[in-house]
Amino acid sequence: MRRGEGSDIASSRPYEPGDHVHAIDWKASARLSAAHGNDEFIVRERHAEEMSRVVLVIDRRPSMALYPDELPWLNKPRAVEFVTDLLVASALNQRGLVGYLDLGSHANGHEAGTPFWQRPRSQLSTWQGDLRERVLDYLSGGFDAPDDGLERALAYLSTAARGSLPLGTFVFIVSDFTAPLSPGSWARALEQRWDLVPIVVQDPIWEQSFPSIQGVLTPLADPGRSTRRLVRFDAKQVEERRRANQARLDGLLTDFAGLGLDAVLIGSSNPNDVHAALLSWAEHRAEQRGRRI
């Protein structure tokens, strides 16, 4: 939590679901309600109560639906669920505000390709439900975001949602990053002086590398399609795929480091492995900050 001096009022705004009832300015709300002839509420935001903000940007492209439960590889939806739950729990433990953004389809007619944006908010009251459960429910949407969904998401945060995200906001971008973002997208996001954290979710066998399946007739599924096709790779093709995948990951992590971003690599959907990866990132971050002091 970032605290200002004293408890001076920093600003006021209309009430939104999720705001604490204690933050309502009842006198100002009464005046506004009387003037407009209906119930309207004003919320006070104080310097001393300015909480840290965490935003989760979740990639919902078809490749993020891999791999099915019956296969012995990384189940990305489950890994993303564990990542999301740990980040939300950590933010709430620090009394932070949590926001969410993706470009997939959702219930109630929300179409793929349009921002599904939930501004940062605190833990909901008991009768409104648990914020952790609500965020996890967002992950039940479709895996049908466009290929440039992450670029659109970062552009949305830098424009339409910018007013909700002060300097120092943590923005966790969760994706397999197999569809690269343009340097300009990262540059515009970095200009906002947010704390950007890429979380790379890739299967260690099929995406970080490639298995030795030369000569074996192998069924492969195309992301976003229910059908599978049978393919057979020779030794040269296997080696080319392996080198290409390894180079892609190495290049991705190198690019992130060049931008000053500490990426997290997730290659397992086991809760303990996910927790260990995030804990290692947090410890490394604390160590790096200690060196700068």
Tell me what each language-model feature is.
Residues 1-4, 14-22, 28-35, 43-47, ...:
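Exposed, interaction-prone extracellular/peripheral surfaces
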